[in-house]
Amino acid sequence: MDRISSAAEQALAPQVALAAAPATGPLHKLIKVAVSCVPWLIIGGLLWAGLFIKPQPVGGTVQPPVIERRDHFFGLAAAPAGGIWVAGSSGKIVSIGADGRIERMSTPTDQTLQDIAVWDAQRAVAVGNDGVVLTTADGGKRWTKVDGIPRSEVANKLTRVRVATGGRAVATGEMGALLQSTDFGATWSRLRDEEDVAWNDAALLAEGQVVAVGEFGRILRSTDGGASWQEPASGVESSLMAVAFRNANEGVAVGLEGVVLVSRDGGASWQRAESGAQAHLFDIAWDEANQRWLGAGALGSWVTAAADAAGWRAGRVDERDLAWHTRVLPAGKDAWFAGANIGRWDGQRWAALAGH
């Protein structure tokens, strides 16, 4: 037994000695070099991937909706082909077709647009913050920014634009801005010198008559296209926000604190009417189809009266909707409202557009 163990130990001794001997051969050196290079190979591979491999998107690109919840739309006009155009935040002009299709037009500005008006099937104009004026001559396919707009060194927001036949337009705004164009918005000039008052709206009547309303209850009237002006008393100190006429004589102006003024002599004199509204009123329109006046304002407010502008009634488009509206546009039996949201009201039911 001892001899067997001894023989086994002798047989294993060379192998143990071989295993215990230090590995200093060429193969071992090659292995060490290869192992030491592994981290650098990994780092190099990551750098190459970062520089030269471009990740590919999976699935389609998510496009934001045309009308987003954060959008406000201050201007509203009947579109040439039916439906409406609205103008507002970030230079947006949006077409809402009679079939409900909603499309954003391409515009060359990010300035908020305050109003939009349409002459005919091809030509329209929009105005807004910092004196921006845009025009189109192809039905809204392309909008062009107009240069050379008269500017103030203080403030230049244009809040409203009204148009009339023959390419005439008047834009109102801060620092006494009353600007006129007679060539479909291509060029503009001042109707009055700059002053520290905001004119909020103007009505263009026949034969060169202009009636403008603004801050502090001020009213201006011209019968010669702006060559000379009269300032009839309004009897109120609240800022007047909008004015409209249904013919050469009968007009209505509305303003803050529910103010409603009525004129029956082309704006030469004004009388206050009891509107029944407590909220601010921002717009007034004559609804020819329904032979009524219709106004819009804060907290979803509306006011209305018959053609004689007497017996005013007030209410809200929806008790659950407290959005303010700066524009109202009669449309058949219904009316469009635009402001903090856009919606259609039939006198009973309010339907806000998706996204608002």
Report each predicted region and the residues it spans.
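Residue-level hotspots at or immediately adjacent to binding/recognition sites across diverse folds
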Residues: 2-356
